[in-house]
Amino acid sequence: MKKTILFFNIFLLSLSSCVDEKVLNPVEQINLQSSRDYLLSENLFNHIYRSIEEGFIYNGQAKNCPSYTLLNQNINNSDTLIIDFGEENCLQFGQLKRGQIICTFNEKYHTSGSIINTTFSQFYINNILIEGNLELSCLDNNLYQLEISNTSLTTNYGVININGSLEKQMINGQNSIYNYLDDIYLVNGNISGNSSNGNSFDILISDPITYDLSCFQSSSCITQSGQAIITPNNYENRLIKYGFSGCDCDIIVEYNNETTLIVLD
């Protein structure tokens, strides 16, 4: 009987050890969750602004998906542009979208002094619900300020919350405002948020990130170069390095003397 109890206790210890090992593996993945969630949100914001700029260029043309509605066309007050993808998913630029992007604005997209305030109504990209407020101000013809306020991305594995302030300097494409695919921006700023596992984080762009919109012609990602430091709560800093190999969605994250490749979908 004693032998049986001993063997059973050894079995329990062995089982406990296996369980502990399985618990440790997800923790290691969670260490990169903030990095993954931030990179996902950055990519989705870039796609939102591609849709918005398309809307300002093509709002007078009839399209099935999306449709454009321009309201209050009065030069003395703000106008409203509704970019409507409908209630069912439709495909735009390789992304499934539904719902509405709603922009109120006082001037056109690239006009100095313009302020474009963006909200959402049941808007999804690839079945990720996006809510909150984005405000893009054109400080002059080449400099833009993006304020991200109370923005959330509801995914299958949790909610990502994002707030921040980014400065975008256009370094190419100034002379072709109706062809955004030759635009290149240098981006600086700070981001804070909560990842889908509930852990908070802060982002500091340490080396300006290059957004090359010509990459949209062959990829769903436009980040070409630059670096950002991400500080998740209770974890060491991670260094995000863009521009792994041209117009792709491969991004390197360095932490704790280790290098991890994150590939965005």
Range-by-range predicted roles:
Residues M1-T4:
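Positively charged n-region of N-terminal signal peptides that target proteins for export
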Residues S14-S17:
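C-terminal motif of bacterial Sec signal peptides marking the signal peptidase cleavage site
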Residues V19-D265:
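Low-complexity, intrinsically disordered segments exposed to solvent
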Residues L6-N9:
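Sec-dependent N-terminal signal peptides
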